[in-house]
Amino acid sequence: MSDNQELHVDNPSAADINVREDRRDFIKRSMVVMAAGAVAAAGATGQASASPAVAPVSRLKRKEAIGNTFDYLILGGGSAGAVLAARLSEDGKKSVLLVEAGPSFDPEQYPEELYSSNIIAANADPRYEWGYYALPDKQEQPVYTPRGKVIGGSSAINGAVACRALPYDFERITAKGLKGWSYEEVLPYFRKMETYHTGRDEIHGRNGPFPIHQLTMDYITPVQKAMVESSWKLGYAKVSDFNDPTANNGAGPNPMNIVNGVRVNTGMAYLSREVRERSNLTILSDALIDKLRFQGNRVQAALLADGREVFGKQVILSAGSYGTTAILLRSGVGPKADLAAMNIPLVKDAPVGTQLLDHAFYWMNFAARPELKGKEHPVVGAQVWTHSSFASSARELDIAVSPSHLLDPAISKTGVAFSLGLELMKVKSTGTVKLKSRDPKEAPVIQFNHLSDKDDMRRMVECFRLARKLARTEPLKSLIVEEIYPGPSVGDSDAQISEALAKGVGTLQHPCATARMGLASDPLAVVDGEGRVHGLQGLRIVDASIFPEIPLINLNPNVIMMAEKIADRIRGEEA
């Protein structure tokens, strides 16, 4: 796909052009709102960024990418990579090359599959989504595990729920001896990244590039509102801000990175037109990365699938938990025995891909009353986030239930359907990511092993019972005609619920921990606390793969925070 193509239309008709212009105007209006909010919020300090809606756009500097050595070579332009490219290129003396396997769009011209908050996983469009499947465990078929393939990465295809990790999560990290990762030390980067117009000033940012909008009870759907009210009736607390660590155990509307129905991804928020105009920033899109080339223990270059090479004094892998893992393995960084089986020369024996973590997920589907037809947006908008009886304390929020409107209504006899999504947040079961072959065009082999740990299953059984209890509690009860899946054939015994969960468990699309952060003495660690790969020179990893534990909530805002923090650290080292 060439840089100036927008919809892969060879000979656009007048209708095509009108659709494209309507899309552009819609995104532009939304981003003007986003930028105006940041300007208003920054007024007190006199600091405001130029609106990307009016900034000029330049052609991507492809020719500069090949043959030149950049100060920073960033491999992967997703939730972390786009942030790194924007922040590291703020230093005009440093050159930055961002390489992305998928397409690059003008920040105001993303296609509907990517900008619409009512579309998840880009409708499985292979132009923008990798199409990965994990091997089944007890499920009857492989598990679809979508990942974004575009500037913005999975932040362009996800549910846009913008919840931060808990202080409890960061205590688990610092308990491993990793310095700089306490809640108090990461809070400035959460604030730096966001524009958030509600909540307490001491915990929220007001003029960052990433807009987060706190939904209200008046905005969410009748089903979502009813589930929240049923949760309150059962005694769960009223939550007005899930990102407030003093008051987030309970039920309420979600914070979302959505403006006027536009899911704002990092390619929009961080790589604005103004940022892309920087003379020291080059973006190479539609460029599949094969592997890294080393001289001794120092990384020299990255080899693309078409045989070209790109060079950087510092190389940063930000290709996501699957992509980063596969690139490392093809490069000879991984378990020695696995590499030998693939005839890949060993560069570094490391536990890459051996400790995959992911939030297990299960759909409980319902037929809803027919008068709710047309009242199904936003498709995601609320949750009850709490602790099970198996949690170590009330601070360990290990389960959640979230109502959504993503089902095909044809499955319901009323023509209206919704789901209660069961989410396991505290995870012990580990999986793997391995190579199927040395071909970079071939998907890695993903094995989740969801609910294989007995504690995970116990927590998920309790989450299942909570969802059913909510469905049987007013006012949600009155909106339900019947439970479609798993249905009345699955009773309330542990055995029946466990069997249903094992057969139907899927992914919340939060893979992480395949190249874990840890001390050099930690046998499971691949990188140190700054993302530097142990035993190798010039190579960092900055994406969800380096989380040493899976946060008890969505990953995307936490990956963005991580990228902000490590970018700041890199710039500090260079100063």
Q: Where is each model-derived feature located?
A:
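N-terminal export leaders
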Residues: 22-39, 327
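C-terminal segment of N-terminal export signals and the immediately downstream linker at the start
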Residues: 14-20, 41-82, 91-95, 103-106
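Conserved redox-cofactor binding core of oxidoreductases
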Residues: 18, 169, 174-291, 295-299, ...
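N-terminal secretory signal peptides
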Residues: 1-25, 49
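N-terminal FAD cofactor-binding segment of flavoenzymes
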Residues: 101-146
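Glycine-rich loop(s) and the adjacent beta-strand/alpha-helix scaffold that form part
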Residues: 87, 91, 95, 102-107, ...
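FAD cofactor-binding and catalytic pocket of flavoenzymes
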Residues: 179, 360-469, 505-513, 521, ...
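A glycine-rich dinucleotide-binding beta-alpha-beta segment and adjacent secondary-structure elements
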Residues: 258, 290-291, 400-402, 475-550
